[in-house]
Design a protein with these regions (language model features):
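Short strand-turn segments of transmembrane beta-barrel domains in outer membranes
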Residues: 179-182, 190-200, 209-240, 248-255, ...
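Transmembrane beta-barrel wall of Gram-negative outer-membrane proteins
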Residues: 230-255, 268-303, 320-339, 345, ...
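Periplasmic N-terminal accessory/gating domains of Gram-negative outer-membrane beta-barrel systems
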Residues: 1-4, 38-41, 65-67, 97-200, ...
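Periplasm-facing N-terminal accessory domains of Gram-negative outer-membrane beta-barrel systems
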Residues: 1-93
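Hydrophobic, lipid-facing positions within transmembrane beta-strands of outer-membrane proteins
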Residues: 13, 150, 207-209, 223-225, ...
Length: 404
């Protein structure tokens, strides 16, 4: 007698993990199948894909700060799910167990850290201004330069050796007020990842570190606004649905007001000041479960000026800042194949202007007026198109490809 045993068929379970209230996608949410002992995480767009054997499965969906959700089902075909997790602020019994010593060595994300947004907002900071980069400075292997500045020295590297990404697009200058603040407004940020080593191939090469910042998509259910007043800056944010469950927007603005008070303590013939502002805006539209569109905008600027006026006139201004416009299209070709196409424009400008006028009285009573105007300009303009593909053939394997 001969016994023939056929292997079980495998099917793919894919979908998105969302916040139950705002319908924001959750980046890095965990999906674990208790029966087969395999799992995966959501990508930067909240999408997951996992291939499992045919039959009954019991999935745990979890994310920090949210209640664990269990889903049991019989998998007999490729299935797409949208999972909504609920906030859980209750602290149950906590059992602290130490990891095995080799856990960090065997991890595929060795050298990577995720910084929770509540941790950033609650970290004590200079002038009570919460800052993303200053929170990163508290991590092991990261140091700051001058006290109070936001520069990152990661494992001996310099600040110019770091790659800063905002929604996947590089920023060439991330400092405000000579490094006292960064351009990342905490209220507009959704996820922050720091890579100190073992950089994922999708980022290309970098000498020191990669700081990957993702911004909020906007609430698809309810309108919500907030106003924050600080010692250096004030922040205003408003978000809500344009078409409930399909289209949302978010607008976030921050500005300093040093320039409003500094002239009050200066001599009458002198004026000077400093100001900064950041504007973040995003439009998010879901065409279907397979197609989503994101349009992001960022503009930030620092402005320093000084002028005096008596018999002579002098004026000098320094301006620098970033402008970023980013359009991203997500498409699910198959349950195992996910793509993201990005069209991005990025501009960085640094300008110094000087204007000077002087008058010389001649013996014959005539006046000679000399004037000069100087402009020192430098900048970078980037226009890029890229497509990334993620293929998940097996739970423990992921294949990616990018076209730039």
């Amino acid at each position: 007698k001969y016994a023939l045993q056929s292997s079980k068929k495998s099917f793919t379970l894919n979908g998105y993990v969302l916040d139950s209230i705002s319908k924001e996608t959750l980046i890095g949410a965990n999906i674990y199948d208790q029966k087969n002992g395999v799992g995966t995480t959501t990508n930067p767009f909240g999408y997951f894909s996992i291939t499992l054997p045919e039959g009954g499965i019991k999935l745990n969906f979890s994310y920090i700060g949210y209640a664990v959700k269990q889903v049991s089902l019989h998998l007999w075909k490729d299935t797409m799910l949208t999972i909504q997790l609920h906030n859980d602020n209750q602290l149950n019994e906590v059992i602290i167990l130490s990891d095995k010593p080799e856990t960090g060595i065997q991890s595929s994300r060795m050298g990577a850290s995720s910084i929770p947004i509540p941790h950033i907002k609650n970290t004590p900071a200079l002038m009570s201004e919460a800052d993303v980069l200053k929170s990163i400075q508290l991590l092991p292997g990261v140091q700051n330069g001058m006290n109070g500045t936001s520069g990152l020295y990661v494992r001996g590297g310099g600040p110019d050796q770091n790659l800063y990404l905002l929604d996947g697009v590089p920023l060439y200058n991330v400092d405000h007020t000579l490094g006292l603040l960064s351009v990342f407004t905490p209220e507009a940020v959704k996820k922050v990842d720091l890579y100190k080593s073992s950089f994922p191939a999708r980022f290309g090469g970098r000498l020191s570190s990669i700081v990957d910042v993702r911004t909020n998509d906007g609430n698809m259910q309810h309108y919500h606004g907030s106003l924050t007043i600080g010692l250096l800056t004030s922040h205003l944010q408003f978000e809500g649905p344009i078409w409930k469950d399909h289209t949302s927007f978010i607008i976030s603005a921050r500005r300093s007001y040093i320039d409003c008070f500094l002239p009050l303590v200066m001599p009458k013939d002198e004026r000077g000041g400093y100001s900064l502002y950041d504007i973040n805006a995003k439009l998010n539209h879901r065409f279907s479960e397979q197609d989503r569109l994101f349009i992001s905008f960022y503009k930030g600027k620092d402005h320093v000026y000084y002028k005096y006026k008596d018999e002579d006139k002098f004026k000098q201004t320094h301006d620098w800042g970033n402008i970023l416009l980013n359009t991203r299209w997500n498409h699910v070709f198959t349950p195992q194949l996910f793509s993201n196409t990005t069209l991005a424009y990025n501009r960085y400008v640094f300008d110094i202007r000087q204007e000077e006028t002087s008058s010389i009285q001649q013996p014959d009573g005539s006046t000679i007026i000399n004037g000069s105007h100087n402009l020192f300009h430098s900048g970078i303009n980037d226009l890029s198109v890229s497509t990334d593909f993620d293929y998940h053939p097996l739970p423990a394997h992921k294949i990616g490809r990018a076209h730039v």
